[in-house]
Amino acid sequence: MTQISILGCGWLGFPLAKALLQKGFSVKGSTTSMDKIAALRTAGIDPFIVQLGEQKVSDTITDFLANSEILVVNIPPKLRGNATENFVAKIEHLLPFIEKCTVTKVLFVSSTSVYGEDNLHVTEATPLNPDSEGGRQLAV
């Protein structure tokens, strides 16, 4: 059975995890809140508390990634109220753990903010034109 780890089981990651379980996948899910652990477990998701920081990643990351073939990175940059956070540094600290584990495929969930506010049809070929700090950091 394919094991998938979803880093960030919030408004998008949690329903994604439940849908993957229904398709027969084994799913690990992360949250930053102890309050959400029970809900993840009740849904059949193997829950983990994982904290990504600009300086380090929590020790739980190794067990979270262990035996997973696919990693879905689904965490927001959280820059609306705090433009001083460095989302790129957080992802850079995650990379060595991914490189050392069994993950062979990574899906990074981004945001339409990397395209700016042109209100045009967007495809994968659309040039990036971020107009916010979050969009700029995601575009990196």
Where are the language model's segments positioned?
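Conserved Rossmann-fold cofactor-binding substructure of NAD(P)-dependent oxidoreductases
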Residues: 43-68
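Active-site Tyr-X1-5-Lys
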Residues: 131-140
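Aromatic pocket-lining residues of Rossmann-like dinucleotide-binding sites
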Residues: 20
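Conserved N-terminal Rossmann-fold NAD(P)-binding element of oxidoreductases
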Residues: 4-8
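N-terminal Rossmann-fold cofactor-binding loop
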Residues: 29-35, 51-53
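N-terminal Rossmann-fold NAD(P) dinucleotide-binding loop
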Residues: 13-14
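Conserved Rossmann-fold NAD(P)-dependent oxidoreductase catalytic core, especially the SDR/UDP-sugar
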Residues: 92-132
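NAD(P)-cofactor binding segment of oxidoreductase domains
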Residues: 68-107
